[in-house]
Amino acid sequence: MRLTPKELDKLMLHYAGALAKSRKERGIKLNYVESIALISMEIMELAREGNKSVAELMQQGREILKADEVMEGVASMVNEVQVEVSFPDGTKLVTIHNPIEDNGKLTPGEYILKDEDITLNANKESISIKVTHKGDRPIQVGSHFHFFEVNALLEFDRAQAFGKRLDIASGTSVRFEPGEEKNVNLIDFGGKQKIIGFNDLTNAHINKENKEQCLANAAQKHFIH
């Protein structure tokens, strides 16, 4: 007997489905792969009988497994199952949407958010400073960039900005267009109060002792102040 690769795939799927069915009958909750295999196998067998339409198979496909017969989270992971099956009049694709009724439990990786506003950077004192862009190209500053060390062509009171960052949501930024003047709010950095990198003006703990040296570094590198 010679089998084509497609026929071998169907046999493997049938074997996996039969194994899943055996486990289900023994009361074992099925995982993601087992659930897909069982639904696919049952649809192939029902189609092989030759007395059901595609619409009927789509409906029956939703009745093969219940949420309490699979592992937690599996029901919501299986959004659809597609099976290419043989009918008396040819091969057709049967698509079953949401084949396992969800049980209302949490989805793996799901975010559950409170139905209320979230205060950003709560309990942190914020200051406002005026910034003027003296360059000829746009400059974008990220939320956690040490504002004291931003682009040398941004003019503002750098002494006030020492040890501070933008008072905006993490991962967002503020854009400065050439010639633009705007006020921004700054808050203190958290954590261990040690700043490394950026434009190499600090590379030290944020304190009064280091501030004067950092200001001197900025002046030496021609950062507008």
Swiss-Prot record:
<dbReference type="InterPro" id="IPR002026">
    <property type="entry name" value="Urease_gamma/gamma-beta_su"/>
</dbReference>
<keyword id="KW-0963">Cytoplasm</keyword>
<comment type="similarity">
    <text>In the C-terminal section; belongs to the urease beta subunit family.</text>
</comment>
<dbReference type="GO" id="GO:0043419">
    <property type="term" value="P:urea catabolic process"/>
</dbReference>
<dbReference type="InterPro" id="IPR036463">
    <property type="entry name" value="Urease_gamma_sf"/>
</dbReference>
<protein>
    <recommendedName>
        <fullName>Urease subunit alpha</fullName>
        <ecNumber>3.5.1.5</ecNumber>
    </recommendedName>
</protein>
<dbReference type="GO" id="GO:0035550">
    <property type="term" value="C:urease complex"/>
</dbReference>
<dbReference type="InterPro" id="IPR002019">
    <property type="entry name" value="Urease_beta-like"/>
</dbReference>
<keyword id="KW-0378">Hydrolase</keyword>
<feature type="region of interest" description="Urease gamma">
    <location>
        <begin position="1"/>
        <end position="102"/>
    </location>
</feature>
<comment type="subunit">
    <text>Heterohexamer of 3 UreA (alpha) and 3 UreB (beta) subunits.</text>
</comment>
<dbReference type="GO" id="GO:0071281">
    <property type="term" value="P:cellular response to iron ion"/>
</dbReference>
<dbReference type="Pfam" id="PF00699">
    <property type="entry name" value="Urease_beta"/>
</dbReference>
<dbReference type="InterPro" id="IPR050069">
    <property type="entry name" value="Urease_subunit"/>
</dbReference>
<dbReference type="Pfam" id="PF00547">
    <property type="entry name" value="Urease_gamma"/>
</dbReference>
<comment type="pathway">
    <text>Nitrogen metabolism; urea degradation; CO(2) and NH(3) from urea (urease route): step 1/1.</text>
</comment>
<comment type="similarity">
    <text>In the N-terminal section; belongs to the urease gamma subunit family.</text>
</comment>
<dbReference type="GO" id="GO:0009039">
    <property type="term" value="F:urease activity"/>
</dbReference>
<dbReference type="GO" id="GO:0016151">
    <property type="term" value="F:nickel cation binding"/>
</dbReference>
<dbReference type="InterPro" id="IPR008223">
    <property type="entry name" value="Urease_gamma-beta_su"/>
</dbReference>
<dbReference type="InterPro" id="IPR036461">
    <property type="entry name" value="Urease_betasu_sf"/>
</dbReference>
<feature type="region of interest" description="Urease beta">
    <location>
        <begin position="103"/>
        <end position="225"/>
    </location>
</feature>
